């Protein structure tokens, strides 16, 4: 936009259309470096802005705006435009036109809701999904009458431009609005129509008034109100759009000569009829069905018999029923209002509603199949009655027509029974047909209303609203036609775009070669519409009996596959894609089409009997109108009988019109209409699928830009000069680049001088810009280069300006200091003088006398003043005289002052501008400096953050190591605490005197030891689980590092590793916390036990209960640990999400520190508890000190037991220490693996770089070879062309020779009659030249449009071809005529004037012929009337054509000269030629055969050379790849010996292939040398043949013999070459069998080198990925192998431990047996003891009873002990149920303990009352009990040890199994990789076979070309024979001329060859050629 009016900037809609000056200036001042700023691909945003940091070879390291630093390939970077182009309004002005810049500009503008953007001729519109204030009347007023570049991009700007072009140029206009469904096409169409209605308003009511005066409206209202009517019947809800137009329309708004609105009309295309009977999920039928059912008019549904709910009617209730935000009731009111304004009568609208309701009733008609019959019958008639009533027909006849239609069999009409499927098809087809014809009637009725007959129509503006290009998962018949329409529209745009470009280049006087890009799409268009194309074959299949969709698809494949570049076999479906039968390469991409239902949709059959009923409807006049043009079979038969012309549309007896024919006819009409208009293009874009405002889906938008042709338009722009600037603008902006040259006042001269200066400096070349009349044109990217130069110069100027200012300020400061110094010196001098004089006496006297002297001197002063006054008066007088003189001078000077003032004001303005620019520069500098400082600060912050991250990582690693050390310290402290506890327990046990208390304390300590061992075991398990977690985390870290290697994000990798470590640390800390809690619980339990002991075991039972509760808590904790382990696995799966929560790591770390502090506090508390325990132990020791002496013997026994316990505890502690050391080793190993991975990463990077460099070298070598090959191919083609040109030249010369001979005969008879016709013939010649020029222009126009007219009919195409040939012959005849005229002139000058009457007759004949030629030309003009516009524009080619005519005349003169020479030669050697003609013919035939063989051999050799070259190149690269892949596969799944064997085999194969290649190359070189020799020999033979024609008979005979010998040698050479070729083919087959991976590269080499490069890159990346995966798998296998070996070693150790355990178990069983015997003995001893106690307590009956009870309880204990022993035996026999039986054993033991404690209490009570004897007896009994309990405890300890060892064994075994499973899983993965590679090889082999087939097809094409060459050679021979005949005729004519030299020619003899006869002769010659 060149400028925005200030008034418009205040409009509310301006922020959504344009950018303010301040915002644009701020954007332009943003820092930018064109060498660093770029776009790079991004998977989410499409492209993202980045800044280049460094470049290494083809790799570039960039930092994106997101802050990520990545490395990409250089060719992936796209240039970024300078900031001045940000949010540019016309993307064609972008200096770098690429996808990234276009997408970025659209995204930036759409963020500000600026939805309109220009792209050259396009106006791109993005759906805002919200209401914007940019369509108000105020906005319309701002755009009315404004040029496009004066206002921001808007639909109104394009509309107004179209309106002004129509009014000014008197030319019809068109606006093409395209886009996907939901892009806003319909809304923009309505806005355009409204704008035209307002602009061309007539302000007069043009609507047709009804009788009541209520119907109708103004013409403007009626044009606008067509939209509600069309939307009601033509719009529907789709998945992507709630109001989607399901038809295309072309709305023409007509205007009068003065620009007033004069009516309008509508044409529609491609209505989606299938929606009437079928809707997809998420969609619904057309709006009118739901508006009728909305209840807006309650009586309407009753009239239409729609009594049921909408869901009842199947045709319109298959999916959605309502639309969010749309009120069907209100929409019905608007539709009815639109009907009223449009002037529809009530009966017309009611018929429309009735027909619509009839379709709804038809959908509910039910039919059923008769049993055992192929006949359907009605299943209920209610809906049929309703449907028939609505359609105005009889229900019975309607049902009969559907179930038993009348068909013609021979000459009779019979009723044919229909099955159920056929009836349903007939109902659906009839419903669709009724709706389609009803819609067409509505269009016709609206056109009738909009026809304002009272206003004359002069011009129109058409608006095309049609669906854009569609690529769906399943593409069918509809998509084919939509895409074909868009293909034609895109071709129209390409052609129109470059026509405009060429016109502007010509206006500006720029040399330019026209390129018609419309021809780029011609191949695809011809594939679809040409004869034997897709549509032609479809129409043919529709009339072929028993044709199916599959036969149609197969015909397409047979006809076009491999023969047409735009036809392909579809690739297998991916994702949700459906099956496809063929694929077409459109301009927007390759589309896969499914041919299902193609035939049915194309035929669109109807039931003629039912249609006949509808044509005779009695109650619905609409049916009569819509079916009026339909001709049924019966009507056609009757018309045929009556001899009438069948004018119906369809009927089998009449012409059969398919849907494709109808579509093609309407499309051709549309294209013809568009070619007669000046088009304007609107492209609508969907921003996202979510209908969210301001959000851009980059991938979706890019796809639409491709489909809409925007990127295609940009591609075309780049071919020319897309950037252009006016001379004043260029001078104003870039004058700084060449200040001297810019001093010119003429902007053009100044601009040219600036460009010359830049070109001389080497910054620009002449090809990068062109100088026009008013503008300068630039290639893409040049303006960016100029901006860089301007920025550099500005930087230098600003720097110099700053230095000058600093210099000036420094000099001013120096001057100020100098002046200050001078003043100071004067003051100092005066002060020093005053200091000297102030003490001098004379000075004092002077000071006193000086005041007194003033009074005496006043008189003298007065005298002096009088003298001065006199002098002053004289001076005043003189001043008055001078003043009078000066006043006159002042008057003159005032005028000069005014003039100077004006110039001063101008200079001030310039100075103000300069100051303003200076100020802006300063602001810009300040802004840049501030941004630079900000960026520097950001860079420093980023560096600091990186350093902080590194420090945090180091700190985290240190914290982790500290944590592990702390864990080790905790373990040491735990062990110390355990040792201290054991020592305290030992002291307690050693000090216990009382037997019962000591036994109880020992049992308690054993239990506590068990608990402690259980906690240690849990801790060991936790440590083992942590080890497993660490291993698992190491694997995850390796995978993450692999991903980071692929993405080369080292920082993210470190962060993720840190996160993993942090997580592991938190897990370890959590587990430690759990373990610490367990320890705390145990400590509490221990404290409770000691309290219980201090209270003399009174609460022992309660304590045991608490212990049981604690056991349950421990079990719960174990379950919690398992749950946490499962949760850990889930968290590991969420590891990817943890990367986004890096900020939480600090908080987690602080929480971990707090937990460590809490852990430390708890440890301290534990230390306090230990101190309390010591105090309690001391008290307990004091209480039992008195019993120490009595228990010394028992203490010794207990000391032995305690020492064994201490030993076992020490073993457990040592085991824990060993496990901790193992963890440390694993950590060190993981660190070593990490460093190894780092080294591997660096090595892989180096390998990748070397691979890239080698690939670049290979690409360079490949390019060099291809250049060499292209040069050789060019040379070969040149030689072939020379051969062909020679043959054609000879043929043409012979033909022209014969023509000239005939002309010579005629001219010799009329030489004396041409002088008087000189002027007449000259004028006729000028007329003929004009006719020729016109025909030349017509030929060019016809050539440009022939592609668009080929679809009319076959006869017209043939006629056009003949006319083109006739025109070419006519051109040659005109050239000959010019030469003849020159000859006539010469002869006339020499021979004088004769035979005036004959000349007059010849003149008349010539005029008649000229008139015939003129009539022919006029016929051609009528045929190509559609190209008149192009023909007028090509008038400028007249001069070129004239020069061509002159050149042709010169060539004819040259040929005439040669003809005379040939005449002398022919006259001299005629006789000899006749004798030797047969021999010459034989020699020539042999020569032609030899040339054919040579050409064939050369072609085969070229193909073989190309194949061998590509084979050699690809063999080298692919052999290396095969070697690498084989090495990798060998490393992954084979042994070293197999790998070496494969390597040797591959090396042998490689050597064989290399030898074969060398042999093939040698053979190829030999063949090339032979071909060259053969060509040289052929050229020599030809030269010799031509020389022998002019030499004597003897030389001719020698030449013939030499030629014969040469032929024999060539024959031998050809036979040798044939053998060598067979050998080469054998080698080629061998190479094809050996190399299976060549197909992709070969296929791509045949198609395009660029595709080959992409494929090579793709496979190189694949190889790198496979190599990396195999290396990773190899490393994992090595680890697994090591782990497996270690597992085997551990299994061996476990096996030995198992054997030891078995031995221990046997020892335990023996001990149990001994214990059982001892129990028996103890029982007997107890019995004796009981008897003794009962004897001693005879005197105390009461105590005796109690003692007996105690003995009974002891017996019960013995029984329980026996049961416990049996349970132990069962536990050793059944290891699987050991844990459960152990718990049962523990429960029994606790029960025994409780019984024993009760007994001990009873014994204590008895001890008080028993005497010493009883105490002694009881002492003996207690000893026995103590021994028994000691044995029980020993057995329990052995059981516990065995259980722990068994658990350890099971745990190790589970670990080994897990690792074995991992190994098996990795082996399976390797097998899968091998299978994938095998599949890849199979695919390559299949493609190689396809390539072989293509090679064979190419050979067939070559053979056909050779056959054609042979045919041409035969024609050449015939031409020579005709030349002989012509020579004979010439001699005869000469004799005849001599005989009749003195005789006048007869009357009517044609003196001048007529143009038509010449045309016929040339046509015959052309056909002969």
Curated annotation (Swiss-Prot):
**Presence of keyword Transmembrane helix:** no
Q: Which domain of life is it from?
A: Eukaryota
Record remark on domains: The rodlike tail sequence is highly repetitive, showing cycles of a 28-residue repeat pattern composed of 4 heptapeptides, characteristic for alpha-helical coiled coils.
Q: Where is this region: Actin-binding?
A: 667-689, 770-784
| Assembly and binders | Muscle myosin is a hexameric protein that consists of 2 heavy chain subunits (MHC), 2 alkali light chain subunits (MLC) and 2 regulatory light chain subunits (MLC-2).
Q: Where is the IQ domain?
A: 794-823
Query: SMART domains of this UniProt entry?
Result: MYSc
Functional description taken from the UniProt entry: Essential for muscle contraction. Involved in ovulation likely by regulating the contraction of gonadal myoepithelial sheath cells.
InterPro entries named in the record = Kinesin_motor_dom_sf, Myosin_head_motor_dom-like, Myosin_N, Myosin_S1_N, Myosin_tail, P-loop_NTPase, XRCC4-like_C
Q: What else is known?
A: There are four different myosin heavy chains in C.elegans. MHC A and MHC B are found exclusively in the body wall muscle. They co-assemble into body wall thick filament.
Q: Where is the composition biased (Basic and acidic residues)?
A: 1137-1164, 1176-1197
For the modification N6,N6,N6-trimethyllysine, the affected residues are: 130
- Region spans: Disordered: 942-966, 1006-1029, 1131-1213, 1234-1255
Keywords (alphabetical) are: Actin-binding, ATP-binding, Coiled coil, Cytoplasm, Methylation, Motor protein, Muscle protein, Myosin, Nucleotide-binding, Thick filament
Q: Which GO terms describe its cellular component?
A: A band; cytoplasm; myosin filament; myosin II complex; striated muscle myosin thick filament
Q: Name one Pfam family in it.
A: Myosin_N
Q: What happens when the gene is disrupted?
A: Worms exhibit retarded embryonic development and paralysis. Muscle organization shows disruption with abnormalities of both the filament lattice that constitutes the A-band and the hypodermal cell. RNAi-mediated knockdown causes an accumulation in the proximal gonad of endomitotic mature oocytes in 51 percent of animals.
Tell me its family. Belongs to the TRAFAC class myosin-kinesin ATPase superfamily. Myosin family.
User: Which residues are involved in binding ATP?
Assistant: 179-186
Protein name, please?
Answer: Myosin-3
Q: Which biological process, per GO, is one annotated for this protein?
A: locomotory behavior
């Amino acid at each position: 936009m060149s400028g925005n009016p200030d008034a418009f900037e205040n409009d509310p809609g301006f922020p959504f259309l344009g950018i303010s000056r301040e915002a644009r200036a701020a954007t332009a001042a943003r820092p930018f470096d064109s060498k660093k700023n770029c776009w790079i691909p991004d998977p989410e945003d499409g492209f993202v802005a980045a800044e280049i940091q460094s470049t290494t070879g083809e790799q570039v390291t960039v930092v994106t705006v997101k802050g990520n630093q990545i490395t990409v390939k250089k060719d992936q970077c796209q240039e970024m435009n300078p900031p001045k182009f940000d949010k540019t309004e016309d993307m064609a002005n972008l200096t770098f036109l690429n996808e990234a810049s276009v997408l970025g500009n659209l995204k930036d503008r759409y963020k500000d809701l600026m939805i309109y953007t220009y792209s050259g001729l396009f106006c791109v519109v993005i759906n805002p999904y919200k209401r914007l204030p940019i369509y108000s009347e105020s906005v319309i007023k701002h755009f009315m009458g404004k040029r496009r570049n004066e206002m921001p991009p808007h639909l109104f700007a394009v509309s107004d431009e179209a309106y002004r072009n129509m009014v000014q140029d008197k030319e019809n206009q068109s606006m093409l609005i395209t886009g996907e469904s939901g892009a806003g096409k319909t809304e923009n169409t309505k806005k355009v129509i409204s704008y035209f209605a307002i602009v061309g308003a007539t302000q007069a009511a043009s609507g047709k008034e009804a009788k009541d005066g209520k119907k109708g409206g103004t013409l403007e209202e009626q044009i606008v109100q067509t939209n509600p009517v069309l939307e009601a019947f033509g719009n529907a809800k789709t998945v992507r759009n709630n109001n989607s137009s399901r038809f295309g329309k072309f709305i023409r708004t007509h205007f009068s000569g003065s620009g007033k609105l004069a009516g309008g009309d509508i044409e529609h295309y491609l209505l989606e009829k299938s929606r009437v009977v079928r809707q997809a999920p998420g969609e619904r039928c057309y709006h009118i069905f739901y508006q009728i059912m909305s209840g807006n008019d309650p009586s309407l549904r009753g009239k239409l018999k729609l009594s049921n709910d909408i869901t009842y009617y199947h045709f319109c209730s298959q999916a959605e029923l309502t639309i969010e935000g749309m009120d069907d009731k209100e929409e019905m009111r608007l539709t009815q209002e639109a009907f009223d304004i449009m002037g529809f009568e009530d009966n017309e609208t009611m018929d429309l509603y009735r027909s619509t309701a009839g379709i709804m009733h038809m959908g509910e008609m039910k039919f059923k199949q008769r049993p055992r019959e192929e006949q359907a019958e009605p299943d209920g008639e209610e809906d049929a009655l309703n449907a028939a009533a609505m359609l105005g027909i009889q229900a019975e006849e309607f049902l009969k027509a559907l179930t038993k239609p009348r068909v013609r069999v021979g000459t009779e009409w019979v009723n044919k029974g229909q099955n159920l499927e056929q009836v349903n098809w007939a109902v659906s087809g009839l419903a669709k047909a009724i709706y389609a014809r009803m819609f067409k009637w509505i269009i016709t009725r609206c056109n009738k209303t909009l026809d304002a007959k009272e206003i004359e129509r002069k011009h129109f503006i058409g608006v095309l609203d049609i669906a854009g290009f569609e690529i769906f998962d399943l593409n069918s018949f509809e998509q084919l036609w939509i895409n074909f329409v868009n293909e034609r529209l895109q071709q129209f745009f390409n052609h129109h775009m470059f026509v405009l470009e060429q016109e502007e280049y010509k206006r500006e006087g720029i040399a330019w070669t026209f390129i018609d890009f419309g021809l780029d799409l011609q191949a695809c268009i011809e594939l679809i519409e040409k004869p034997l194309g897709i549509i032609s074959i479809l129409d043919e299949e529709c009339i072929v009996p028993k044709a199916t969709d599959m036969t149609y698809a197969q015909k397409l494949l047979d006809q076009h596959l491999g023969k047409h570049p735009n036809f392909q076999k579809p690739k297998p479906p991916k994702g949700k894609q459906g099956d496809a039968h063929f694929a077409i390469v459109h301009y927007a991409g390759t589309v896969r089409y499914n041919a299902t239902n193609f035939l049915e949709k194309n035929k669109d059959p109807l039931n003629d009997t039912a249609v006949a009923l509808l044509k005779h409807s009695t109650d619905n006049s609409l049916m009569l109108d819509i079916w009026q043009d339909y001709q049924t079979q019966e009507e056609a038969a009757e018309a045929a009988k009556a001899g009438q012309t069948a004018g119906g549309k369809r009927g089998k007896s009449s012409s059969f019109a398919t849907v494709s024919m109808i579509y093609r006819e309407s499309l051709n009409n549309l294209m013809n209409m568009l070619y007669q208009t000046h088009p304007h293009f609107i492209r609508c874009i969907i921003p996202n699928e979510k209908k969210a405002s301001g959000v851009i889906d980059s991938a979706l938008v890019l796809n639409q830009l491709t489909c809409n042709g925007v990127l295609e338009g940009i591609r075309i722009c780049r071919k020319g000069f897309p950037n252009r600037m006016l001379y004043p603008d260029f001078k104003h902006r870039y004058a700084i680049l060449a200040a001297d040259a810019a001093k010119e006042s003429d902007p053009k001269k100044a601009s040219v001088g600036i460009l010359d200066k830049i070109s001389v400096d080497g910054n620009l070349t002449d090809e990068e810009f062109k100088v026009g009349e008013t503008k300068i044109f630039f290639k893409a990217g040049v303006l960016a280069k100029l901006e860089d130069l301007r920025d550099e110069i500005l930087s230098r100027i600003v720097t110099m300006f700053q230095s000058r200012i600093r210099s000036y300020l420094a000099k001013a400061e120096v001057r100020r200091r100098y002046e200050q110094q001078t003043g100071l010196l004067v003051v100092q001098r005066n002060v020093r003088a005053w200091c000297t004089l102030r003490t001098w006496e004379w000075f004092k006297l002077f000071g006193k006398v000086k005041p007194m002297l003033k009074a005496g001197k006043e008189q003298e002063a007065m005298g002096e003043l009088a003298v001065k006054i006199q002098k002053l008066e004289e001076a005043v007088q003189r001043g008055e005289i001078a003043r009078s003189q000066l006043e006159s001078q002042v008057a003159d000077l005032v005028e000069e002052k005014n003039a100077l003032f004006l110039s001063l004001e101008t200079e001030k303005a310039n100075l103000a501008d300069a100051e303003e620019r200076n100020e802006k520069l300063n602001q810009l500098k300040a802004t840049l400096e501030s941004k630079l400082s900000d960026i520097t600060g950001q860079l420093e912050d980023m560096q600091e953050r990186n350093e902080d991250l590194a420090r945090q990582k180091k700190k985290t690693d240190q914290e982790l190591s500290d944590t592990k050390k702390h864990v080790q310290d905790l373990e040491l402290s735990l062990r110390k605490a355990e040792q201290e506890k054991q020592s305290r327990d030992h002291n307690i046990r050693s000090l216990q005197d009382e037997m019962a208390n000591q036994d109880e304390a020992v049992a308690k300590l054993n239990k506590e030891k068990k608990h402690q061992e259980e906690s240690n075991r849990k801790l060991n398990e936790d440590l083992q689980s942590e080890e497993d977690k660490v291993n698992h985390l190491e694997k995850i870290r390796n995978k993450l590092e692999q991903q980071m290697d692929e993405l080369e994000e080292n920082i993210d990798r470190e962060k993720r590793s840190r996160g993993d470590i942090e997580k592991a640390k938190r897990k370890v800390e959590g587990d430690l916390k759990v373990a610490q809690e367990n320890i705390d619980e145990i400590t509490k339990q221990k404290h409770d036990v000691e309290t219980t002991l201090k209270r003399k075991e009174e609460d022992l039972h309660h304590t045991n209960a608490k212990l049981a509760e604690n056991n349950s808590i421990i079990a719960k904790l174990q379950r919690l640990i398992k749950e946490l382990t499962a949760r850990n696995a889930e968290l590991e799966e969420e590891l990817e999400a943890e990367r986004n929560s890096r900020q939480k790591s600090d908080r987690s770390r602080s929480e971990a520190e707090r937990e460590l502090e809490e852990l430390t506090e708890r440890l301290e508390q534990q230390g306090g508890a230990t101190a309390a325990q010591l105090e309690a132990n001391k008290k307990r020791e004091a209480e039992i000190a008195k019993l120490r002496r009595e228990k010394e013997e028992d203490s010794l026994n207990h000391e032995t037991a305690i020492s064994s316990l201490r030993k076992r505890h020490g073993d457990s502690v040592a085991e824990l220490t060993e496990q901790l050391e193992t963890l440390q080793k694993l950590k060190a190993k993981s660190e070593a693996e990490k460093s190894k991975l780092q080294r591997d990463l660096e090595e892989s990077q180096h390998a990748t770089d070397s691979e890239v460099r080698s690939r670049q070298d290979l690409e360079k070598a490949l390019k060099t070879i291809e250049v060499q090959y292209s040069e050789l191919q060019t040379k070969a083609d040149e030689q072939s062309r020379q051969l062909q040109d020679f043959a054609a030249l000879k043929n043409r010369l012979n033909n022209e020779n014969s023509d000239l001979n005939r002309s010579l005969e005629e001219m010799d008879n009329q030489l004396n009659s041409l002088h008087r016709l000189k002027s007449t013939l000259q004028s006729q010649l000028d007329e003929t030249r004009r006719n020729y020029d016109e025909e030349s222009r017509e030929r060019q126009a016809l050539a440009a449009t022939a592609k668009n007219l080929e679809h009319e009919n076959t006869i017209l195409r043939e006629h056009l071809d003949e006319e083109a040939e006739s025109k070419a012959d006519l051109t040659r005849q005109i050239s000959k005529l010019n030469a003849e005229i020159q000859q006539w002139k010469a002869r006339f000058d020499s021979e004088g004037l004769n035979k005036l009457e004959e000349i007059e007759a010849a003149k008349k004949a010539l005029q008649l012929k000229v008139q015939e030629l003129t009539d022919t030309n006029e016929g051609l003009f009528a045929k190509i009337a559609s190209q008149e516009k192009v023909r007028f524009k090509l008038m400028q080619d007249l001069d070129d054509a004239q020069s061509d005519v002159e050149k042709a005349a010169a060539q004819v003169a040259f040929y005439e000269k040669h003809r005379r020479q040939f005449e002398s030669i022919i006259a001299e050697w005629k006789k000899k030629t006749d004798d030797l003609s047969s021999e010459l013919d034989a020699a020539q035939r042999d020569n032609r055969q030899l040339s054919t063989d040579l050409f064939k051999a050369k072609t085969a050799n070229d193909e073989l050379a190309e194949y061998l070259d590509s084979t050699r190149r690809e063999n080298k690269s692919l052999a290396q790849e095969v070697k690498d892949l084989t090495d990798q596969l060998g490393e992954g799944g084979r042994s070293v010996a197999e790998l070496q064997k494969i390597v040797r085999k591959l090396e042998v194969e490689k050597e064989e292939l290399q030898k074969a290649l060398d042999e093939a190359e040698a053979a190829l070189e030999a063949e090339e040398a032979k071909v060259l020799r053969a060509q040289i020999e052929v050229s020599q033979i030809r030269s010799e043949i031509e020389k022998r024609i002019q030499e004597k008979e003897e030389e001719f005979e020698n030449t013939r013999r030499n030629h014969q010998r040469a032929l024999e040698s060539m024959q031998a050479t050809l036979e040798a070459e044939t053998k060598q070729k067979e050998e080469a083919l054998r080698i080629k087959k061998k190479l094809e069998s050996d190399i299976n991976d060549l197909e992709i590269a070969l296929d791509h080499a045949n198609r395009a080198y660029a595709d080959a490069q992409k494929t090579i890159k793709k496979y190189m990346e694949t190889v790198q990925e496979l190599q990396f995966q195999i290396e990773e798998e190899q490393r994992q296998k090595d680890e697994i192998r090591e782990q497996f070996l270690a597992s085997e070693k551990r299994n061996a150790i476990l096996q030995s431990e198992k054997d030891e355990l078995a031995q221990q178990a046997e020892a335990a069983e023996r001990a149990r047996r001994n214990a059982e015997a001892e129990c028996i003995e103890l029982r007997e001893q107890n019995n004796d003891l009981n008897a003794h106690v009962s004897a001693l307590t005879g005197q105390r009956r009461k105590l005796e009873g109690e003692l007996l009870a105690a003995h009974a309880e002891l017996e019960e204990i013995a029984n329980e002990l026996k049961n416990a022993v049996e349970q132990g035996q069962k536990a050793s026999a059944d290891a699987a149920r050991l844990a459960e039986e152990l718990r049962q054993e523990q429960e029994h033991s606790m029960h025994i303990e409780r019984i024993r404690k009760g007994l001990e209490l009873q014994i204590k009570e008895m001890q008080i009352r028993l005497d010493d004897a009883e105490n002694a007896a009881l002492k003996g009994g207690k000893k026995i009990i103590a021994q028994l309990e000691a044995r029980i405890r020993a057995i329990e300890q052995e059981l516990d040890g065995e259980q722990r060892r068994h658990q350890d064994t099971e745990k190790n075994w589970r670990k080994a199994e897990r690792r074995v499973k991992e190994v098996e899983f990795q082996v399976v993965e390797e097998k899968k990789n091998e299978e994938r590679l095998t599949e890849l090889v199979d695919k390559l082999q299949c493609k190689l076979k396809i390539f072989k087939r293509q090679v064979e097809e190419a050979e067939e094409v070559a053979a056909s070309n050779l056959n054609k060459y042979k045919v041409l050679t035969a024609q050449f021979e015939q031409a020579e024979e005709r030349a002989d005949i012509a020579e004979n005729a010439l001699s005869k004519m000469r004799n005849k001329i001599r005989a009749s030299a003195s005789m006048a020619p007869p009357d009517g003899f044609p003196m001048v060859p007529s143009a038509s006869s010449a045309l016929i002769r040339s046509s015959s010659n052309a056909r002969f050629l």
